[in-house]
């Protein structure tokens, strides 16, 4: 009996640690075009200009700078090889329901309280960022990023998950 108790407590502990993990919220991202491709070299410099119109509390610009430094780029205040312009548009909560029915009666006698069929409900957060990267050696490239959670959760955890998706996407634009 003690093995079952041990295994059960292990799974409960694993579940609790997953629930407190900030990246546990499932999310995905899409770009408005094919993306940005920047051939860069180690020790090149970057500057981030961050605009937060929604007045959202965020550390997106600092976390992005840290990730870029970990890639081997260096942050400067002036005369940078890459100027990254970020405009954080907003973070919104979306909720809607849609009736799904298997009844043929639905098509000729619409009754929203009909018991046949099911309701599909979706709840999620989105975060939109407009991005432009200016380079000394190449043309400027721009895109819009829209990150979306798979479901609702704690707002702070959802925001952190969306920001991580956006940061990882921006970092993926740089290749060495």
Describe the function of each predicted region.
Residues 1-19:
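Sec-dependent bacterial lipoprotein signal peptides
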Residues 8, 37, 75, 118-122:
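Residues embedded in well-ordered secondary-structure elements
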Residues 16-73, 91, 175-176:
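A structural "domain/chain start" motif
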Residues 40-42, 78, 123-125:
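Solvent-exposed loop and beta-edge segments used for protein-protein assembly and interaction
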Residues 48-55, 117, 148-157:
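Second-shell loop/turn segments in exported
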Residues 71-83:
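Short acidic low-complexity segments
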Residues 82-152:
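Surface-exposed short loop/turn segments
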Residues 149-176:
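C-terminal partner/receptor-binding element of secreted or periplasmic proteins
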